[in-house]
Every structure is written in structure tokens, then in C-alpha cells.
């Protein structure tokens, strides 16, 4: 896009003098707007300013170094402001049209197959990417759970979760679990960041949070991460199907036998997801207590329901592997 300069002012905002019309797609966490803009009634693009101050230049880096290795599962990057522009950074993408952010197992399986591909990239391809994601690493998350142990116990008691789960929280905080190698992660792969076009194609969006992490990070965001604006109902059968697909696809890409450690990997996932969901419940609970929140409270209540359901289902799946005491107290509400 050689003429991008005529559409963007030096301060990194759209120049209305050379634009036919514009419409807001969504608002970033820093208040800046991602917009579709038309240069004529027939031709449109997507303008994305820096929407998160901690991710400056990262999405462009991922496009330049990573995404060209994959099929067209992402909108094409047409122009950018160049590195080091700070709050004046911007990018322009192709407009892939109206998008549907609706959960289906078919879509999730398509995404997880591509995920296995970027997780299988050797470290030499992503060695220069920043190490931080949009949320704390799992070790920091569980440390916070221990710091807020009194609140955690209240939530666990309310949901009928045995205090035995606190033992696993302490083990993870000590670094005794989740010791696998880190891979390149999308970083924020909830339902709002992948979508179906009108022609039925699946696109994976918003790569500005890409960073090295455990493969469980991306899997949790795809499967069990809830979002106030993009509700979904995850089932145990869908969760199993997505995990099986990921394990088999990863094994095929790496030339290994997927069945060898399938149960162990699933147990790690269920524990990771339960810990992350418990932490998310504390965040949602905090938002619900605020008089003014970023999200409508009815949306937060829906998110609470989805997250608590994921937590309980993952603990029940973990219980299926246990011979002795379980995580779920069967006497509660019986």
C-alpha cells in the first residue's frame, strides 16, 4: 500500500480529508479505536492504532518474521508507521469484511490445527519476540492465589471444591508442575480474536500479544477462556475433542506418537485451566464489586457462569484420574 501516507496524519490518526467514510470496529484497552475506513464506496481498509501500550511494534514483528510461514489465516498487513513511533504507531490491514465470532467445534478444531503449527516452530524463528504476555504467567497467577488465599477458600467453599486443591496451587507456585518447553504463543486467543468471514473462512486476529509461553496458555484461551463480549458454552466432549486434535496434530508435525503421553498432557491441561479459571473468578468478582466497570454487569455475570462451569468441569476431569481423595466435595449441595 504505497499511498498509505495520505490517509494517516503525522500524529498517527486518520486524515478525514482523504477518507470517504469511517466506522468503529472496537475500542482498545487504551481507548483508541480500531476502524474500518473507506477511500471510496467500493474500497475499504482496517486502521489499527496502538491499542495496548505494552505491545508497541510486536504485531508488525510477528507479521514480518512468523506469519508469512503459514497459510492465509490472518488479514494481510498493508502498511505500518514503522518502528519506534510509540503512541503514534499504527497499522493498516486488508478489510476481510463482516466477521462472526460464534463458537463451534468445527471452528475451534480448525484453529487448534493451526496452533499446533505455530507451536512447532523452532525457537530460532521467534527468538527476538518479547517475553511478556497480556496476563501474568501461570506461576505468578498461582502465587497471587496464595496471597489471596482467604478469598480463594471462600470461592472454593461456595462451589464445593475441596481444600485439597490448595495443595496443587502450592506445588505450582513452587515450580513443581508445568515444566514443559515454551513455544511461540498467540497469547490472547479468546473467541474475540478468531472469526469466520461471510465466505466461511477462519481468520486469526490481533497478534500483538504473541510471546513465548507453555502450549497450555494458548489452549486455555481457545478452550476455556471466557470473555464478556464473546460468550460461549464449552462442553466436556468438545474440550476432549480439541485437546485430542491438538495432541495428534502436534505429534504428526514432530514425528512422535501422540498417544504416548496423551493422558499426562490432558491432566496438565485440566490443572492449568482450573488454576487459571479460579484466578479469573477473582478478577470477575472484583469487577462486579465496582460501581463503574468496563463491561456491563450482566455480561460479567454471564462470564462468571462460564468460568465457574469450566473450573468445575476441569476439576471433575482431574478427579477421573485420581484414585484417592477428590477435588470436588460430593457432599456439598447434595
Give the role of each language-model region.
Residues 14-39:
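ATP-binding glycine-rich phosphate-binding loop
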Residues 31-57:
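ATP-binding glycine-rich loop module of kinase domains
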Residues 76-87:
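Short beta-strand micro-motifs within the conserved protein kinase catalytic domain, predominantly
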Residues 86-98:
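Conserved short submotifs of the Hanks-type protein kinase catalytic core
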Residues 98-133:
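Conserved kinase catalytic-core helix
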Residues 130-175:
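Active-site catalytic-loop/activation-segment of kinase and kinase-like phosphoryl-transfer enzymes
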Residues 216-255, 273-294:
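Active-site activation/catalytic loop segments of kinase-like enzymes and analogous catalytic loops
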Residues 273-334:
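ATP/Mg2+ or Mg2+-diphosphate-binding catalytic cores
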Amino acid at each position: 500500500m504505497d499511498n498509505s501516507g495520505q490517509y494517516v496524519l503525522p500524529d498517527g490518526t486518520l486524515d478525514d480529508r482523504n477518507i470517504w467514510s469511517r466506522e468503529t470496529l472496537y475500542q482498545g484497552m487504551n481507548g483508541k479505536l480500531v476502524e474500518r475506513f473507506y477511500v471510496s464506496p467500493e474500497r475499504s481498509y482496517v486502521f489499527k492504532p496502538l491499542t495496548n501500550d505494552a505491545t508497541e511494534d510486536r504485531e508488525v514483528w510477528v507479521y514480518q518474521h512468523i506469519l508469512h510461514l503459514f497459510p492465509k489465516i490472518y488479514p494481510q498487513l498493508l502498511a505500518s508507521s514503522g518502528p519506534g513511533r510509540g503512541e503514534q504507531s499504527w497499522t493498516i490491514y486488508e478489510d476481510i469484511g463482516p466477521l462472526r465470532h460464534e463458537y463451534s467445534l468445527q471452528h475451534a478444531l480448525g484453529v487448534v490445527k493451526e496452533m499446533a503449527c505455530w507451536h512447532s516452530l523452532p525457537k530460532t524463528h521467534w527468538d527476538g519476540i518479547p517475553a511478556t504476555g497480556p496476563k501474568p504467567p501461570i506461576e505468578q497467577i498461582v502465587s497471587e492465589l496464595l496471597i489471596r488465599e482467604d478469598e480463594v477458600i471462600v470461592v472454593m467453599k461456595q462451589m464445593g471444591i475441596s481444600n485439597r486443591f490448595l495443595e496443587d496451587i502450592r506445588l505450582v507456585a513452587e515450580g513443581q508442575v508445568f515444566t514443559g518447553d515454551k513455544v511461540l504463543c498467540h497469547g490472547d486467543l479468546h473467541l474475540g480474536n478468531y472469526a469466520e468471514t461471510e465466505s466461511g473462512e477462519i481468520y486469526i486476529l490481533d497478534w500483538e500479544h504473541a510471546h513465548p509461553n507453555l502450549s497450555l496458555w494458548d489452549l486455555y484461551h481457545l478452550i476455556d477462556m471466557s470473555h464478556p463480549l464473546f460468550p460461549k458454552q464449552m462442553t466436556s466432549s468438545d474440550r476432549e475433542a480439541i485437546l485430542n486434535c491438538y495432541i495428534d496434530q502436534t505429534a504428526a508435525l514432530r514425528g512422535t506418537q501422540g498417544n504416548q503421553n496423551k493422558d499426562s498432557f490432558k491432566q496438565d491441561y485440566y490443572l492449568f485451566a482450573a488454576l487459571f479459571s479460579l484466578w479469573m473468578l477473582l478478577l470477575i468478582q472484583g469487577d462486579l464489586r465496582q460501581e463503574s466497570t468496563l463491561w456491563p454487569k450482566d455480561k460479567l455475570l454471564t462470564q462468571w457462569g462460564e468460568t465457574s462451569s469450566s473450573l468445575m468441569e476441569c476439576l471433575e476431569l482431574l478427579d477421573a484420574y485420581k484414585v484417592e481423595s477428590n477435588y470436588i466435595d460430593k457432599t456439598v449441595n447434595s
